[in-house]
Amino acid sequence: MAAPGARRPLLLLLLAGLAHGASALFEVKNNGTTCIMASFSASFLTTYETANGSQIVNISLPASAEVLKNGSSCGKENVSDPSLTITFGRGYLLTLNFTKNTTRYSVQHMYFTYNLSDTEHFPNAISKEIYTMDSTTDIKADINKAYRCVSDIRVYMKNVTVVLRDATIQAYLSSGNFSKEETHCTQDGPSPTTGPPSPSPPLVPTNPTVSKYNVTGNNGTCLLASMALQLNITYLKKDNKTVTRAFNISPNDTSSGSCGINLVTLKVENKNRALELQFGMNASSSLFFLQGVRLNMTLPDALVPTFSISNHSLKALQATVGNSYKCNTEEHIFVSKMLSLNVFSVQVQAFKVDSDRFGSVEECVQDGNNMLIPIAVGGALAGLVLIVLIAYLIGRKRSHAGYQTI
């Protein structure tokens, strides 16, 4: 990736950390009675495609944002749940859908709609579509208490990271205002004086553990993989020092994916990270390969904690469709100047997988080179033994020639 292209995402990420708007208050009412109140500032980090590759954009919730009345509701008991929809700009929508049980309520789902035809935020975008992304959230509180979170709340969607700041949210209000009692988010945690700070992750962790992945679609399995993954990330810390750290992908992370005619995706995620691997296919040569990597991640000690990178022009882990790619040697896949993906002990097969088993193996060049080393050493030793044997026979013949027969 060219240097200007690498600097632009970093600059946008820095701007994302600085673009903190003031908190705004939003209310949903029914016949003049308030049922939902929410106060927060928000930003939306996403990527989009241009002719020059992926771009990152950070959109702040403007002061002009308002409640969309025909998209918000107090809900009806046993019929529908309350929802808050905020509208701004050219077709942007943020929706919070609430639900409750006997003791707690929560934001069960969050939706964000954005418009790629908006040239102010998406200049030179190839697509002009309107997209809606969604995710579940960890926003929950006790009934008759307000949910309070001073820290950033990050909600990771497929191609969007929503960040809420300085948030107070309450649904199912019993009065027309926030309750004095509050349920605090886990991010705020205890006071820092109650214990020592958490240590930073090690610069170089141990090698990752091999994980098994399986992606199934309507026509059966489209991806079978066994591999250990490690992220090598370079970022700017809060003290303005640049550091490179390695993060292992755990077998305990949640995996999912999708099967398409020309694209197979594998998504591996936990509460702080979403990694997506995209496999493409060259139909003319009947080859599959890793063509794209997308990462959204939280880095707590970074100057800009939200880290988002993608590259869709890769060509790695390549093999014939119907066969599996295998490599025992560690591979380093360059994604950008800020991210590389390290792959260990990989065997992967995409698009065509019969009976949920790997097909014929196509080994990587690196493994072939590694096999040459013991062969060369063995050949050298055999040659040395042969030379010693020849020298011995020549020496023995000469010693016999030195005596005369009586």
Swiss-Prot record:
Residues 189-218 are annotated as: Hinge. Keywords: Cell membrane, Disulfide bond, Endosome, Glycoprotein, Lysosome, Membrane, Signal, Transmembrane, Transmembrane helix. Residues 1-24 form the signal peptide. InterPro entries: Lamp2-like_luminal, Lamp2-like_TM, LAMP_CS, Lysosome-assoc_membr_glycop. Its main location: membrane. Residues 25-370 are lumenal. Residues 193-205 have a biased composition (Pro residues). One of its GO terms (biological process) is Golgi to lysosome transport. Residues 25-188 are annotated as: First lumenal domain. GO terms for molecular function: enzyme binding; ion channel inhibitor activity; protein domain specific binding. It is found in: Lysosome membrane; Endosome membrane; Late endosome membrane; Cell membrane. Interacts with ABCB9; this interaction strongly stabilizes ABCB9 and protects ABCB9 against lysosomal degradation. Interacts with FURIN. Interacts with TMEM175; inhibiting the proton channel activity of TMEM175. This is Lysosome-associated membrane glycoprotein 1. It comes from Mus musculus.
